[in-house]
Amino acid sequence: MSWIEKILPRTKSPTKSNVPEGIWTKCGQCDAVLYKTELEKQLGVCPKCNHHMRVSARARLNQFLDQGERTELGSELEPKDLLKFKDSKKYKDRLVAAQKATNEKDALVVMQGKLKGMPVVVAAFEFAFMGGSMASVVGARFVKAVEACLEHNMPLICFSTSGGARMQEALLSLMQMAKTSAALAKMSEKGLPYISVMTDPTMGGVSASLAMLGDVNVAEPRALIGFAGPRVIEQTVRETLPEGFQRSEFLLEKGAIDVIIDRREMRDRLHSMLSKLHHQQA
């Protein structure tokens, strides 16, 4: 022991604090450390930089619809590996893994409920289920949502977040673009409003069909929206894309969408829109 150590009093190292795991998270945009409970109150929007984080389909539906009686539509539908598809992994194994990870049968959840007392049907994509890819069950559930609207004279809202068509279902997946578009045409014929809300990301076959067919096309701030991704486009055209290309602000400026709405204002703003649209078309 050195002479300095003999003079100085010994200090005890601070004991490790008993902070429970999982109560903090980090913003992917500004790196701010956030209290999860506070983030939930903000509906998954960073209070520091306004970054809209991805939320699960059920969390979004719980945030958006009134508490109380809700009916899930199409929950009995389950995906099947009709093509016996295999890439680096069997499709049926990918389905099992996705179902286990998300506790969902497929990538779209549909609920019939109320928005500030107004009867509505709301569909929400689950991005954690194979990138929110559109396949046979997704298309069938969306059609069930439309059929419920037609039967009960209700408006439809869809929150999209998807990488596009599910390649493991090949042509069966691509068929859903036409199937969902044809269903929405029936809503239009009957004069029932459909509001499409595009969240980050909304790409591929979903953006090329049901996501862009709203009577009002809404987007969350800074959402990536397009068909092919920016890297693919840059490699194809061999040019550098403009700053913010394919982000919702860029699309609004070019007239591709109608409005950008903060998630925390979504209930009030969409209820206001539907009050006018449904009244006019009733």
Swiss-Prot record:
PROSITE patterns: COA_CT_NTER. Keywords: ATP-binding, Cytoplasm, Fatty acid biosynthesis, Fatty acid metabolism, Lipid biosynthesis, Lipid metabolism, Metal-binding, Nucleotide-binding, Transferase, Zinc, Zinc-finger. One of its GO terms (biological process) is fatty acid biosynthetic process. InterPro entries: AcCoA_carboxyl_beta, Acetyl_CoA_COase_Trfase_b_su, ClpP/crotonase-like_dom_sf, COA_CT_N, Znf-ACC. Pfam families: Carboxyl_trans, Zn_ribbon_ACC. Pathway: Lipid metabolism; malonyl-CoA biosynthesis; malonyl-CoA from acetyl-CoA: step 1/1. GO terms for molecular function: acetyl-CoA carboxylase activity; ATP binding; carboxyl- or carbamoyltransferase activity; zinc ion binding. It is found in: Cytoplasm. Its cofactor is Zn(2+). GO terms for cellular component: acetate CoA-transferase complex. Its main location: cytoplasm. Its EC number is 2.1.3.15. Residues 23-282 form the CoA carboxyltransferase N-terminal domain. The keyword Transmembrane helix does not apply. HAMAP family: AcetylCoA_CT_beta (MF_01395). Acetyl-CoA carboxylase is a heterohexamer composed of biotin carboxyl carrier protein (AccB), biotin carboxylase (AccC) and two subunits each of ACCase subunit alpha (AccA) and ACCase subunit beta (AccD). Component of the acetyl coenzyme A carboxylase (ACC) complex. Biotin carboxylase (BC) catalyzes the carboxylation of biotin on its carrier protein (BCCP) and then the CO(2) group is transferred by the transcarboxylase to acetyl-CoA to form malonyl-CoA. This is Acetyl-coenzyme A carboxylase carboxyl transferase subunit beta. The gene is accD.
